[in-house]
Amino acid sequence: MSRAAVPAMLDSGGGSLVHVGSDSGRLPEVGNQDYAAAKLALLALSKSLATEFSPLAIRSNVVVPGPTRTPLYDRPGGFGDQAAELWGIDKESAITRMVTQIRPLLTHKMGQPDDIAQVIAYLVSPLSRQVTAAEWTVDGGALRQV
């Protein structure tokens, strides 16, 4: 996607690339190695693009969501139902357990898609004109990294 966008941005005088990663790139889980590796590589790609193209007025940043309440959790047979079945509890209790015990979030609640969308809206706006080569973590405090 970036490969296609950069020439158009160069022709129009600049722009903002926003990549959507995952905290799985920094906090890999069992059985998720390919996904984690791809998301970590996306961080390096975005920073490389920022290094090359920021002098040409193209910024590049990554939004790094944590657990987010999407249809992957809510659809029949989704993550919520799978966890509920595994633990023998209802779906909402299973999701609460996920974010308080299994993969603790400081907020004790999953993010919503709008939480990520608001950060992306900022990063593509003129308000972020000096923001490039950055990671914006939106994970309810899951990573707690310094």
Tell where the protein language model's regions lie, with residue ranges.
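Residue(s) in the substrate-gating loop at a strand-loop-helix junction
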Residues: 22
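Short, small/polar-rich loop/turn modules that mediate ligand/substrate recognition or access, typified
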Residues: 54, 59, 131-133
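A conserved structural motif in NAD(P)-dependent oxidoreductases
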Residues: 92, 105-116
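Short C-terminal tail/terminal secondary-structure segment
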Residues: 27, 120-121, 132-146
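Short, flexible catalytic-loop segment of classical short-chain dehydrogenase/reductase
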Residues: 64-75, 84
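Active-site helix of classical SDR
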Residues: 2, 38, 46
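Alpha-helical segment proximal to the catalytic Tyr-Lys
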Residues: 7, 51-52, 129
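Active-site loop-to-helix junction immediately N-terminal to the catalytic Tyr of the SDR YXXXK motif
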Residues: 28-36, 48
